[in-house]
Amino acid sequence: MMKIMKKAFAMFVAVFTLLATLCMVPVSAAGTVVAQLYGRIEDNGQAIYKMVLDYGNVKVSGVDKDTYTVHAKTSTEGKRPADETAYGDKDQDRTIVRVEEKGTKVEIYFDENDGAAGTLSYLATGARNIPVDIEYTVTQNTPVKVSAMDGTDLGEDT
């Protein structure tokens, strides 16, 4: 009887350990960060006013306006005749006016009058707007502090 109890207990511990291991969330600094753009409708069309960076399962702190550089490239190439001029194709850095830490996310707010916020380009021929292809590149200039959800310090994420 004792042998059966020992085997049952060993099986119970093995199953419990396996389940506990499967339920653990791995915590590590983010290698890739998910970014999402947000726009709103203004008098002259839609403007991108903020970007949210999601660091996944780590909290982020120690960020400010100088932590990131955001470059915007908007283009109508391939959507219009090559000899037609488009007013709205841009290739420039966005002006960051504010950065907010919100747990695992960082919200970056842009100056909507910096010339690169628009999602449309004006074509002189036909006097019309067409949507632009948008490409944003985010460069992290300085390390950010990262911590686990329970507050455990994970150091800096470069």
Give residue ranges: language-model regions.
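N-terminal secretory signal peptides that target proteins for export/translocation
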Residues: M1-M5
